[in-house]
Design a protein with these regions (language model features):
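Short acidic/polar active-site loop segments enriched in Thr and Asp
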Residues: 25, 57, 81-82
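Glycine-rich, highly charged phosphate/nucleotide-binding loops
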Residues: 37-69
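A charged, well-structured terminal subsegment
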Residues: 114-148
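NAD(P)-binding Rossmann-fold cofactor-contacting core
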Residues: 5-10, 17-38
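Short acidic, glycine/proline-enriched helix-loop-strand junctions
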Residues: 53-54, 92-115
Length: 148
């Protein structure tokens, strides 16, 4: 997971922790600014990860859109089969490059949400709306002016 943070208030930490607790995912942080997150070794780059552990099945990305092209190039260089850009991580040039290189590309989706949906976890929380989006819904107002 590129951009995984040791800060428990960051979305990348929440997703990292969730996937680890599922028991069937082997998630490693890629973050050059930290040695480990929750006792899991962090790698400074995808290349460093691949040299030690092999090619990951999915490269999950929590970085700003302007930082995606070098990440895509590194994913291509190590032979990654898939790249997943989290909610709001959209860079059309990087997406096109990854797609043209033959990677499976997932854009504007959260791997935690999709995992929970796949496992039936959204239904347990009453959240199985079948609508997955990064856009906030506008609150509707009642005729009296209150929020619904």
């Amino acid at each position: 997971m590129i951009g995984a943070s040791p800060n428990a208030t960051r979305p990348s930490y929440f997703v990292f922790s969730y996937l680890r607790t599922r028991g069937r995912y082997d998630v490693s942080p890629i973050n050059p600014t930290t040695a480990a997150i929750d006792g899991v070794k962090s790698y400074p780059s995808l290349a460093a990860y691949a040299a030690e552990r092999g090619v990951p099945d999915i490269v999950d990305v929590f970085r700003r859109p302007d930082q995606l092209m070098p990440i895509v190039e590194e994913a291509i260089a190590i032979g990654a089969p898939a790249i997943w850009f989290q909610y709001g991580v959209i860079n059309e040039e990087a997406i096109k490059r990854a797609d043209e290189a033959g990677l499976d590309v997932v854009v504007d989706r959260c791997i935690k949400v999709e995992s929970a949906r796949f496992d039936g976890g959204l239904a347990v929380g009453g959240l199985n709306t079948q609508l997955i989006t990064s856009r906030r819904r506008q609150a509707s107002r009642t005729p009296g002016g209150g929020l619904r």
